[in-house]
Amino acid sequence: MRNTVSTFQELKNKGEKITMLTAYDYSMAKLIDSSGINGILVGDSLGMVCLGYENTLSVTMEDMLHHTKAVVRGTSNALVVGDMPFMSYQTSIYDAVYNAGRFIKEAGAHAVKLEGGATVAEEIKAIVKAQIPVMGHIGLTPQSVNMFGGFKVQGKNEKVAKKLIEDAKILEEAGAFSIVLECIPEKLSKIISESISIPTIGIGAGKYCDGQILVYQDMLSMFSDFKPKFVKSFGNIGESIKDGVSQYIKEVKEVKFPEEKHAFKIDDDVINKLY
């Protein structure tokens, strides 16, 4: 049975942790979905881990729709959330609703995610009014990397911490069904999680969030450009891939692959007629 926004709320109410990962293509989505994950975020992080950009700012709506369609086709259990890219909702409320609608209508996503606190409250209200579930995102919001001066922990001083608590309450009031808390102190995320009734999903926000999310390339050691402090490696798939490719190259060079069992047969009398 497909997880829904109601599932997320039920899990929080029961005190059971919510599990999420990113996915960007059909085959990986199918693997992750079959593992029993609650939700999959098609993150604009694909700009960095799939497309090689320095940050997420260059990702377009077309990029996001293309990848979201693939992920939806690979799932039958997880709630699929489409990440609204930079400048797809900041320009106007109309654009926010229109582009959110494209994720649902064209890509088949079940919800969308927006970055920001009070500044995007009106956009969230309008999207929810259009019957589209919205996941909020506060703390380190990668689309604001130029304002932050880099990828840095947020909420370490009283002023910013209080602002994050207030933002979380505003997002709940605006109609968000959950909120991602990224790169904020663990004890602050505890206060936020206890201050609102909707689920919090942490990434670099400690154990007190109602759920956790990671970029799958990070948690499987497949992305070597950098490794955030908050990432734990749950499998060295990157090394396994390199080892497998190296072995493939070796066997092709030494004519050990393909073997007879990998080849298709043809009758000798047919072959003899070809000379």
UniProtKB/Swiss-Prot annotation:
Source species, domain of life: Bacteria
Chain residues that bind Mg(2+): 44, 83, 115
Keyword Metal-binding listed: yes
Enzyme active site: 182 (proton acceptor)
Cofactor binding description: Binds 1 Mg(2+) ion per subunit.
Organism from which the protein derives: Clostridium botulinum (strain ATCC 19397 / Type A)
The protein's required cofactors: Mg(2+)
Biological function: Catalyzes the reversible reaction in which hydroxymethyl group from 5,10-methylenetetrahydrofolate is transferred onto alpha-ketoisovalerate to form ketopantoate.
EC number from the UniProt entry: 2.1.2.11
Pathway the protein contributes to: Cofactor biosynthesis; (R)-pantothenate biosynthesis; (R)-pantoate from 3-methyl-2-oxobutanoate: step 1/2
Subunit structure: Homodecamer; pentamer of dimers.
Keyword Metal-binding (UniProt): yes
Family the entry assigns: Belongs to the PanB family.
EC class of the enzyme, as a word: transferase
Gene3D superfamilies cross-referenced by the UniProt entry: Phosphoenolpyruvate-binding domains
UniProt keyword list: Cytoplasm, Magnesium, Metal-binding, Pantothenate biosynthesis, Transferase
Residues holding 3-methyl-2-oxobutanoate: 44-45, 83, 113
Annotated catalysed reactions: 3-methyl-2-oxobutanoate + (6R)-5,10-methylene-5,6,7,8-tetrahydrofolate + H2O = 2-dehydropantoate + (6S)-5,6,7,8-tetrahydrofolate
Cellular localization per UniProt: Cytoplasm
GO CC term (a single one): cytoplasm
GO MF annotation: an example: magnesium ion binding
Protein name: 3-methyl-2-oxobutanoate hydroxymethyltransferase
GO biological process, one term: pantothenate biosynthetic process
